[in-house]
Amino acid sequence: MDSSDSSCQEWCSHGQYWLELGPTDLMERKGSLTLRSHHKKYSKPVLVYSWHRDRETYPKDYDIEGPEEVKKLCNSTYRRLGTSEPPVWISETREKMAQVCLNTKLAKIKSKALLNEETMNSGIIERDTGLPATGFGALFTRHSPDWSKMCTLTTYAEEYAPPYEYQPLGDPCQDDDYSIVHRKCRSQFTDLDGSKRVGINTWHDESGIYANSYVKRKLYSLTGGPIAPFLK
């Protein structure tokens, strides 16, 4: 029996056979496939590397095995945001991306405009190049004068043209004798209820100023009395 044990130890002493046997503490090593550990239970931390260590970012208030009698699972370490942190919270990604602005080598070159007061000169565009201004061979492409004719021309104006030329009647509102004095404006004191109030501000207006007040003061003299004269 002793001879067999000595031969086994001699056989295992060679380095090439150590990987075949494997470590002797495989069943007790933390992080092994058996997950045999005396101070840790199977939970979310075992899914990552170094699961047997206490994670710093793990919410301490979410520990269901804590000493508190009443568990508050809705609380977490993120409750401290807004108290010990600055008022404007900046994410870690934004903080790392802002390092580009601090490094002068990575700073972007200011873009320069192609057209400015110096480069924009009408003489450059309107110079005589010896080429036709429009049409084939022109340096700058331009639309023909009747380019927008298709947009303004309608079927009615094209097919139903008037057979004779005539002078259309002018707008009566453009006459010099036209006035809005005779129009009755909506009273601000008697016509209170109604849906014809214009504008955004629809509250009761008691200013006494109407749309034709300026025209009435211009047409009627203020010394003639309160009764307006009859106009023929």
From Swiss-Prot:
Tell me a GO biological process for this protein: flagellated sperm motility
Q: How does it sit in the membrane?
A: Single-pass membrane protein
Which lineage do the record's taxonomy fields give for this organism?
Eukaryota, Metazoa, Chordata, Craniata, Vertebrata
Provide the species name.
Bos taurus (Bovine)
Span list, region Mn? 153-163
PANTHER family recorded: CILIA- AND FLAGELLA-ASSOCIATED PROTEIN 95 (PTHR35069:SF1), PROTEIN C9ORF135 (PTHR35069)
* UniProt-annotated glycosylation sites, renumbered to this chain: N75
Example GO CC term: the record gives: axonemal microtubule
Q: Kindly list the places in or outside the cell where this protein is found, as annotated in its UniProt entry.
A: Cytoplasm, Cytoskeleton, Cilium axoneme; Cytoplasm, Cytoskeleton, Flagellum axoneme; Cell membrane; Cytoplasm
Q: How does it assemble?
A: Microtubule inner protein component of sperm flagellar doublet microtubules. Interacts with MYH9. Interacts with MYH10.
Functionally, this protein is described as follows: Microtubule inner protein (MIP) part of the dynein-decorated doublet microtubules (DMTs) in cilia axoneme, which is required for motile cilia beating.
UniProt keyword annotations, A-Z? Cell membrane, Cell projection, Cilium, Cytoplasm, Cytoskeleton, Flagellum, Glycoprotein, Membrane, Transmembrane, Transmembrane helix
Q: What is this protein called?
A: Cilia- and flagella-associated protein 95
Ranges in the topological domain labelled Cytoplasmic: 116-232
Record field: transmembrane: 97-115
Show the InterPro entries listed in the entry.
CFAP95 (IPR027905)
Tell me which parts of the chain lie in the Extracellular compartment: 1-96
- According to its UniProt record, in which tissues is this protein expressed? Expressed in trachea multiciliated cells.
